């Protein structure tokens, strides 16, 4: 029996809730729960007013952190089985604490990162990577070539071939991307403004207590398909 789907790739994300989620919808301009664009005209003042330009690259994903990078389904797998496996996985995983979030800049991108990449966070990432790999189709040559252009280290290149993504296991760094690649001048203006805007969220303990299964539609936009608490 063939299961038809409107999604070309799937991923496992942490998608924030509450005030951080509200900020993310306005800042990135995409609501991955409702599957719709969000107009943020006049929502941000300088130096954040040009947020549509600042956030062009991460917009289609919605505010998120990646636990299992986007993948195409194996021909022997289907979406209902993936949905079921997602809930089974979450039922056996414990929440992961990792200190407060902090604004960070790496490679020209602004992101939110935990103050410490805790052992619990590493373990959750590893478990997620391994649990859903049986659903992942192998990368085609175009995917491999595109990733190789990112100047991967030998270990990252090995991970790319084994896991379909270079930034896993020892290379895994939990982060919530907030911008496209920006100039030094742009980052110097934006980061202090974002720190002020997100002061409350940065002052609260950060715990990953739920995950989301997301799907990428034919236009490249990501939608939440399932959410579940980590209840192990």
Task: Place the predicted regions along the sequence by residue.
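Basic, often amphipathic N-terminal segments
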Residues: 2-106, 119, 123-202, 218-232
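Interaction-mediating elements
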Residues: 204-205, 211-213
């Amino acid at each position: 029996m063939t299961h038809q789907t409107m999604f070309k790739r799937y991923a496992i994300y942490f998608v924030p809730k509450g005030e951080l989620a509200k900020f993310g919808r306005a800042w990135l301009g995409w609501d991955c729960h409702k599957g719709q664009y969000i107009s943020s005209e006049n929502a941000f003042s300088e130096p954040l007013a040009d947020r549509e330009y600042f956030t062009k690259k991460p917009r289609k994903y919605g505010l998120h952190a990646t636990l299992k990078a986007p993948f195409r389904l194996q021909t022997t797998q289907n979406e209902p089985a993936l949905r079921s496996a997602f809930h089974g996985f979450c039922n056996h995983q414990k929440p992961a604490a990792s200190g407060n979030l902090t604004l960070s800049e790496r490679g020209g991108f602004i992101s939110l990162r935990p103050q410490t990449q805790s052992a619990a966070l590493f373990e959750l990432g590893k478990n997620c990577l391994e649990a859903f790999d049986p659903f992942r189709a192998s990368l085609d040559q175009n995917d491999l070539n595109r990733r190789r252009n990112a100047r991967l280290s030998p270990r990252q290149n090995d991970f790319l071939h084994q896991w379909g993504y270079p930034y896993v296991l020892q290379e895994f760094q939990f982060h919530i991307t907030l911008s496209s690649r920006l100039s030094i001048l742009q980052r110097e203006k934006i980061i202090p403004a974002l720190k002020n805007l997100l002061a409350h969220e940065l002052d609260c303990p950060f715990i990953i207590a739920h995950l989301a299964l997301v799907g990428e539609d034919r236009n490249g936009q990501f939608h939440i398909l399932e959410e579940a608490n980590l209840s192990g």
